[in-house]
Amino acid sequence: MKNNNSKKSAQIGNISSNKTTVSNSSNLARIQKIVSSHGKLSLDDQIAYMKHKGITFNHITEDAAKDYLSQNTYYYKVTAFRKNIAKINGKYTSLDFGLLSDLATIDMYLRYALIKINLDIEHTLKALLVSVITKSNAEDGYTIVKEYDMCCKNKLLEEKPKFKEKNYIPVDKKIMSRNKKIDGYHYDLYTKRKNNPPIWVLIELMSFGELIRFVEFYYDNNKYNKNLFTPAFILLKYTKNLRDSAAHSRPVLLDIVLQKQIQPTQNATEFAKNAGVEKLERHALVSNKKIHDFICMLILHDKYIKSDAMKSDRKIELTNIIERCTKRSHYYKDQADLIRVYRVLSKILANYHQKC
């Protein structure tokens, strides 16, 4: 009788286990269907899908992860950093959610620092442009606007042969018209200078992309003291994507481990060499777009910012971020690629503003 009861209990247990397996498989199939159609996942679905992909919750519990995803960030942002981790047969073998959340925090600090660095560069270059144009006896502040506009127009027509010239909007009109709304911060400047604005007004209102193009125009056209802008002419364009990612709160550490993405500039390669980055690591990681662009940003900041105090402030902030990377170093013990990036970035930062 006891043997019969034991057999029945085992059978019931097997049936229950089979039902659970079927239920889990059905739930996973449902989640995968949502993912493939780029649909919305609930918090429970997000956790289940991460577990399916091999992401563990050893450093942060599943409940804590749900709180983090609902209060601090969102799924697609924090999981973007998983792309820095290798997969085996489509699944992660050494990735914990704690590492993802830690990278997201480090990324936040880095974005804030990069914005400050870029604002320093942008302001200094605008001030330098106004200064050299003011000092030049060949410039009246208005002729250069016409020259720049003609340059932009010719370049547009060259790049887009089918573009109708009658649809072209002059540079000064384009820049000034962005500020014509009465509730805008620069409306007063617009009303006073909207017709025939001088170059110093346009420089003040230029976007970062427009500033890059104007620096290139100034250099290419052999303007007064153009050699002052040689580093900016070569490197400024490389900082734009990094600056935009930081300004719009997009992850900057995404794909930071990828190698040989670009052919790096000689300036960035030399900077890394002087920082003590070994040849193999230079070849592998200075060719990463974001590491390369970060180096370009540091070179420009060191070149154009004259205040040692400002440079020291930025270096201290970046050094604190590098030190923050080691706060949970045990999360990264199996992440050789990320450790390598950390080592390279530490050397690069140490080479910036060595007076500090």
Language-model segments: which ranges?
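Acidic/aromatic/glycine-rich contiguous surface patches that form carbohydrate-binding/processing clefts
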Residues: 249
